[in-house]
């Protein structure tokens, strides 16, 4: 297991062997920035959602079970890439892009892992896909859980939900009375918001148990060793100090972690952006572009942007979302050279 994976597994080990979530006896050194200072000792810095979901795999097959869980997670992510691209393009193009991303991006390397980034990207992509299909109630569940899985998903989820609210209140063009129309839109919006809040309740409750507040996370209480060897608390909020232009260059072109060098398919995605206006569902394409850029800018500013064993796992959602622009480039080529590519009916 590479990187943070060891500490996600430590959560399961502590629950199974000790019956608690105090991890100082389950890791070699509690003061290397992988645990948090809780009310009653050192507790998980990272989300406990993936360990809880994958615990049955550990109970059945131990560590190998977690690797199996990750493989299944990657398979779900690949299916979601296909489904998302299928909203805009023919199955042939969607399938071609999916295979390209499954084999020619960082996803291939992170398949043999126990990756929280794959897990959180699955939840984010599932929620986005359901919202784009107009299934707001169902979409609110994985979107809420994606925040529990990875706190940096917050701004991405907020933008997706704002888009959902905009579409709900934009209306369907029917001739219902203004009163009935308002009532329906208000009901849909309220139920969606309620489901989203409920989906975030486990996250808030775990924060309350660990840190005494539903709004304080492990990333605000990271434990590191001070000069005297005592625990010092570091807040991740204060770790976004990279100059933007420098950060963009590093994130793109760094030898080991630059996403352009390790995911060259992004060149095709960049080209596909210029033909967004060829797609009927332009608003959805621009939504995907915006949430991808938000994540990109966040990580470009992040001091620890290079702490991935290969490519940049923090930008996994950005890379996966770029697939629709790669498909758009393929669609442009197919039309340019008179190859058949029919647009799915649901976006006509």
Give names to the regions the model predicted.
Residues 171-191, 271-290, 339-341:
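Membrane-interface helix-loop-helix junctions at transmembrane boundaries of multi-pass membrane enzymes
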Residues 109-119, 209, 258, 311:
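Short acidic/glycine- and proline-prone juxtamembrane loop motifs at membrane-interface regions
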Residues 159, 187-272, 288, 292-299:
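Membrane-lumen/periplasm interface segments of specific transmembrane helices
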Residues 101, 164, 197, 279-302:
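Transmembrane alpha-helix segments characteristic
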Residues 43-55, 59-79, 110-114, 255, ...:
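Loop-to-helix entry region of an early transmembrane alpha helix in multi-pass inner-membrane enzymes
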Residues 65-89, 121-122, 126, 274:
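Transmembrane-helix motifs of polytopic, lipid-linked glycan transferases
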Residues 80-83, 99-103, 119-139, 143, ...:
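Specific aromatic-rich, kink-prone transmembrane helix
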Residues 260-282, 289, 323-329, 334:
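Hydrophobic, aromatic-rich transmembrane alpha-helices
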């Amino acid at each position: 297991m590479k990187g943070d994976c060891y500490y996600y597994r430590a959560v399961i080990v502590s629950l199974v062997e000790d019956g608690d979530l105090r991890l100082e006896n389950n890791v070699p050194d509690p003061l290397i920035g992988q645990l948090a200072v809780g009310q009653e000792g050192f507790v998980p810095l990272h989300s406990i959602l993936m360990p809880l979901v994958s615990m049955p795999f550990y109970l059945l097959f131990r560590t190998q079970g977690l690797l199996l869980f990750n493989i299944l997670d990657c398979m779900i992510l690949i299916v979601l890439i296909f489904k998302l691209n299928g909203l805009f393009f023919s199955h042939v193009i969607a399938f071609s892009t999916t295979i390209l991303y499954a084999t020619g991006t960082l996803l291939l390397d992170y398949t043999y892992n126990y990756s929280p980034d794959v897990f959180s990207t699955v939840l984010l992509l599932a929620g986005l896909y359901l919202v784009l299909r107009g299934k707001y109630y169902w979409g609110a569940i994985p979107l809420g859980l994606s925040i529990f899985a990875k706190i940096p998903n917050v701004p991405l989820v907020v933008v997706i939900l704002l888009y959902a609210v905009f579409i709900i209140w934009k209306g369907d063009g029917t001739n219902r009375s203004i009163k009935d129309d308002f009532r329906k839109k208000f009901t849909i919006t309220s139920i969606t918001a309620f489901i989203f809040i409920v989906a975030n309740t486990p996250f808030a409750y775990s924060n309350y148990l660990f840190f005494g507040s539903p709004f304080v996370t492990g990333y605000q209480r990271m434990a590191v060793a001070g000069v005297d060897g005592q625990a010092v608390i570091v807040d991740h909020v204060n770790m976004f100090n990279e100059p933007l232009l420098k950060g963009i260059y590093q994130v793109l072109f760094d030898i080991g972690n630059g996403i352009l060098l390790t995911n060259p398919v992004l060149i095709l995605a960049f080209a596909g952006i210029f033909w967004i206006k060829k797609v009927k569902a332009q608003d959805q394409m621009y939504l995907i572009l915006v949430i991808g850029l938000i994540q990109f800018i966040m990580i470009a500013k992040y001091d620890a942007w290079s702490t991935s064993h290969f490519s940049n796992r923090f930008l996994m959602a950005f890379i996966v979302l770029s697939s629709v622009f790669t498909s758009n480039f393929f669609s442009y080529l197919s039309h340019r050279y008179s190859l058949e590519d029919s647009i799915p009916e649901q976006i006509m």
